[in-house]
Amino acid sequence: MDKLLIGGSKPLNGEIRISGAKNSALPILAATLLADEPVTIGNLPHLNDITTMIELLGRMGVELMIDEKMCVEVHANTIKHLTAPYELVKTMRASILVLGPMLAHFGEAEVSLPGGCAIGSRPVDLHIRGLEAMGADILVEGGYIKAKVNGRLKGAHIYMDTVTVTGTENLLMAATLADGKTVIENAAREPEVIDLAECLIAMGADIRGHGSSTIEINGVPRLHGCRYNVLPDRVETGTYLVAAAATRGRVRVKDTREDILEAVLLKLDEAGAHISTGPDWIELDMKGARPKAVSLRTAPYPAFPTDMQAQFVAMNTVAEGTGAIVETVFENRFMHVQELRRMGAKIKLEGNTAIVEGVESLTGAPVMATDLRASASLVIAGLVAEGDTLVDRIYHIDRGYECIEEKMQLLGAKIRRLPG
């Protein structure tokens, strides 16, 4: 298994390009199953999860063409197997996203129950209940969700008990080809949901209210092809900005957007960062100062994102003062804390709150990544620590960050990959 070797205590300095958002690319790739003409998706990040989704479509008989710029052209009409098999789904929860589109376009779907990161309970029952409300017959047996519909799905009024991003996306996609009008209430408002809706609209869907908690979809008879570029990754953007703040550096990130990152930029401002922005770039400059500790509470968008929580815990470990970080979205999401403690961090856990008392510096140590964002926090900790840090199990990082060591090297970090 690959590891990352990081030499610390050097401010990050320089400029990097931000990749396309994985959490936008995955549902959009699934949405190509709805079209009866080729769809071309650009700005896809080079990530394992994207490769898995492309492999999943290919395994189902869908014809795909990929160019050197990671643009993918998808011909869904060539589909031969309406099954998403366990061996692919188990490595990536987002495979559940093919359920709605397959059912809506082809009248049946069989999808293995998902795998992915080990963060708390993420039930798929809201997806199932929503599709049943639209007239689907669904059976869960032998570890598979087996769904069928006679004719077309029917528009329905669906209230989501809890805000779920993939649940909203699955039902949004299914509703585009349903008979009549579907209303999704308590819908997720994330930028990635908006991006998916914009792509569906480019394919001919009739959608209103995306970005609010009530989405209205008027079903259409068919969706056509389009070309669409995935939006920039706000979590990757935030991760590099926090790394710059923690190391007292100065970093400019390009090909990104400030409007999808407001809650994070607010907290970095509170930490003492000088932030400037342009049409497609954000620059953060600490002017050599130590960051100030910040307190925050995670919640669904537009509040502070749970996917940035671990990175702020890492920054707080070397900040001036004490910060309380409350996690309200996922249980079991402080697995990075015990690893940070091995590096000398002073962190007290009280239920779903991490109280972080900043120390002058951390000490490099061997640590282990437990999930995608926790691993990013360990990289940040390694960058600020004295001595060398060895991060094990970095396949978690590779699921969400494109070429993290190469981008960090461009910013002057001492970091290299050690092949397993």
Swiss-Prot record:
Binding site for UDP-N-acetyl-alpha-D-glucosamine: 93, 122-126, 307, 329
Active-site residues (renumbered): 117
Superkingdom, natural source: Bacteria
A GO CC annotation given for this chain: cytoplasm
CDD domains: UdpNAET
Pfam families per the UniProt record, alphabetical: EPSP_synthase
One BP term from GO: regulation of cell shape
Main enzyme class: transferase
Residues involved in phosphoenolpyruvate binding: 22-23
Catalytic activity, reaction form: phosphoenolpyruvate + UDP-N-acetyl-alpha-D-glucosamine = UDP-N-acetyl-3-O-(1-carboxyvinyl)-alpha-D-glucosamine + phosphate
NCBIfam families: murA (TIGR01072), PRK09369.1 (NF006873)
Protein name in UniProt: UDP-N-acetylglucosamine 1-carboxyvinyltransferase
Gene behind the chain: murA
